[in-house]
């Protein structure tokens, strides 16, 4: 619809902070609509110390049964995806898709560098979830970016979208 298109366009035209805030908003809405309550079931933007004494601030920490915690970090690459999805010319579309995949790879490197598994005060699972809030973008990664999924898995990162979150 027109309102949704205008909201999406304003987010795309905004900076990476606006896009990140939007991704976190989508993630939080999914958690709440699944019946999870903050701060009992999950926490957002909480600062933790890692084993080296450095501050770490994952987007979301979901508290699981058995005193285990699941870290979810929202990574939004809306600009590159929007350009790909809204281009008709196949040559330019291919160029934008490569740019989109490159931005996903950069997000993976950033998440790997954050090294959330080293957070001291929580018992993280072996894998971090990298949340991509745009379902068609996730599907495109699954269909065309198999090397990205394998790269993520090697880094102990699972890429997820709204429909693949585990609740």
Describe the function of each predicted region.
Residues 1-167:
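Amphipathic, heptad-repeat alpha-helical coiled-coil/stalk segments that mediate oligomerization
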């Amino acid at each position: 619809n027109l309102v949704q298109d205008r909201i999406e366009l304003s987010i795309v035209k905004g900076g990476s902070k606006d896009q990140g805030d939007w991704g976190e908003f989508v993630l939080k809405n999914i958690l709440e609509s699944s019946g999870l309550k903050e701060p009992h079931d999950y926490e957002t933007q909480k600062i933790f110390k890692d084993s080296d004494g450095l501050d770490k601030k994952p987007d979301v920490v979901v508290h699981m049964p058995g005193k285990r915690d699941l870290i979810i970090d929202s990574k939004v690459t809306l600009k590159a995806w929007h350009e790909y999805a809204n281009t008709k010319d196949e040559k330019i579309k291919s160029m934008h898709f490569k740019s989109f995949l490159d931005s996903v790879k950069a997000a993976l490197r950033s998440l790997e560098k954050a090294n959330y598994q080293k957070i001291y005060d929580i018992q993280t699972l072996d894998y971090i979830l990298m949340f991509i809030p745009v379902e068609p973008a996730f599907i495109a990664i699954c269909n065309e970016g198999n090397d990205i999924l394998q790269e993520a898995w090697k880094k102990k990162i699972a890429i997820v979208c709204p429909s693949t979150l585990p609740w």
